[in-house]
Amino acid sequence: MKIKRILFFILLAAIVLTIPGPGELQLLAAKSKAPLTLVIDAGHGGADGGAEAADGTQEAELNLAIAKAIQSEGEKKGVKVIMTRETADGLYGEGNLEKHWRKLEDMKCRKEIIASSGADVAVTIHMNCFKTDGNVRGAQVFYPKTGNAEILSASESLAGSIQSALIKGLDDGSNRSQMGRGQIYLLENPTIPTVLVECGFLSNPEDLGRLKQEKWQQKIAECILEGILACIEI
């Protein structure tokens, strides 16, 4: 009788340990869907070129190149990819001439695409820039800090998985850590797990040189996709 009781408690403990935490539910639910649906947002575009390197390289064009590489790799693996933009243009009407209103309309449009997509996760692609210190470098992933607790936890898990894949795959010695970040429009109150990937620093000569290379862009894309798939366990 005593042995049966011990076995019962061992079995109960095993069941409790395998129950997913609240933050994992969103990502685990995605495993049952076929195919995985992913929104890729290439940051900036149009009149908004984003950060600019000393040599004139604009963030928006690099964002789009990496976003398209993720799209291509994802589709090869059976992932359904929704792009917020596929051209150099921004997502705003021609009638809005003031920069502030163009930017606001652009961001609202991106958020609406994500919210109405029915996607499992969303990743927005950006480049960092820190002109006061050109030594700062490396890719870094950010996750939201405000919103639904389960989505926030799932976003944090996703950010960690992508960051790990970038550190391992790029192997550039930067080893940055994923971080929560507020006051980013697309990261505020997300409707699905969402992260922002800063792929490197345009202000760092070494990062910039690599980011302009198609092979490095492809490598970043593969790492990001690997991190997504590892987290969702496709």
What is the predicted function of each stretch?
Residues 4-9, 17-33, 64-234:
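Active-site-proximal helix/loop segments of hydrolytic enzymes
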Residues 53-61, 206-207:
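Periplasmic OmpA-like peptidoglycan-binding domain that tethers envelope proteins to the cell wall
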